[in-house]
Curated annotation (Swiss-Prot):
<keyword id="KW-0007">Acetylation</keyword>
<feature type="modified residue" description="N-acetylalanine">
    <location>
        <position position="2"/>
    </location>
</feature>
<dbReference type="Pfam" id="PF00173">
    <property type="entry name" value="Cyt-b5"/>
</dbReference>
<keyword id="KW-0813">Transport</keyword>
<feature type="domain" description="Cytochrome b5 heme-binding">
    <location>
        <begin position="9"/>
        <end position="85"/>
    </location>
</feature>
<feature type="transmembrane region" description="Helical">
    <location>
        <begin position="109"/>
        <end position="131"/>
    </location>
</feature>
<dbReference type="InterPro" id="IPR001199">
    <property type="entry name" value="Cyt_B5-like_heme/steroid-bd"/>
</dbReference>
<keyword id="KW-0492">Microsome</keyword>
<feature type="binding site" description="axial binding residue">
    <location>
        <position position="44"/>
    </location>
    <ligand>
        <name>heme</name>
    </ligand>
</feature>
<keyword id="KW-0812">Transmembrane</keyword>
<dbReference type="GO" id="GO:0046872">
    <property type="term" value="F:metal ion binding"/>
</dbReference>
<dbReference type="GO" id="GO:0005789">
    <property type="term" value="C:endoplasmic reticulum membrane"/>
</dbReference>
<feature type="modified residue" description="N6-acetyllysine">
    <location>
        <position position="19"/>
    </location>
</feature>
<dbReference type="GO" id="GO:0043231">
    <property type="term" value="C:intracellular membrane-bounded organelle"/>
</dbReference>
<comment type="function">
    <text>Cytochrome b5 is a membrane-bound hemoprotein functioning as an electron carrier for several membrane-bound oxygenases.</text>
</comment>
<protein>
    <recommendedName>
        <fullName>Cytochrome b5</fullName>
    </recommendedName>
</protein>
<dbReference type="GO" id="GO:0020037">
    <property type="term" value="F:heme binding"/>
</dbReference>
Length: 134
């Protein structure tokens, strides 16, 4: 007999997932899928602390930032227990566009000219004092 491929999807609310945020029950969300990683904590190559920090919440951004291998992605599928309920998907923070604080691209004149000029004068003064002693 063929395995039933159209199993009903088990949905979990965000509130329910957030309760599983400890070493006895470690759940997290990746791409709206819910994973129970409790039994994988000690086997995780990055250490169990990494998973426990993300437990009970959405770890999608951190998971993608690490750049997991194809093998790791395949292994992760074995821990899927369901999906985040569609009503709660808007509640998790999507990876925000990072706010980058930039320094003015046109720095003031003193950083471009005054500091190098003072440095050059200082070097010239030291050179002059050094050569006048001989």
């Amino acid at each position: 007999m063929a395995e039933e491929s159209s199993k009903a999807v088990k949905y979990y609310t965000l509130e329910e997932i957030q309760k599983h945020n400890n070493s006895k029950s470690t759940w997290l969300i990746l791409h709206y899928k819910v994973y129970d990683l409790t039994k994988f904590l000690e086997e995780h190559p990055g250490g169990e602390e990494v998973l426990r920090e993300q437990a009970g919440g959405d770890a999608t951004e951190n998971f993608e930032d690490v750049g997991h291998s194809t093998d790791a992605r395949e292994l992760s599928k074995t821990f899927i227990i369901g999906e985040l309920h569609p009503d709660d998907r808007s509640k998790i923070t999507k990876p925000s566009e990072s706010i980058i604080t930039t320094i003015d691209s046109n720095p003031s004149w003193w950083t471009n000219w005054l500091i190098p000029a003072i440095s050059a004068l200082f070097v010239a003064l030291i050179y002059h004092l050094y050569t006048s002693e001989n």
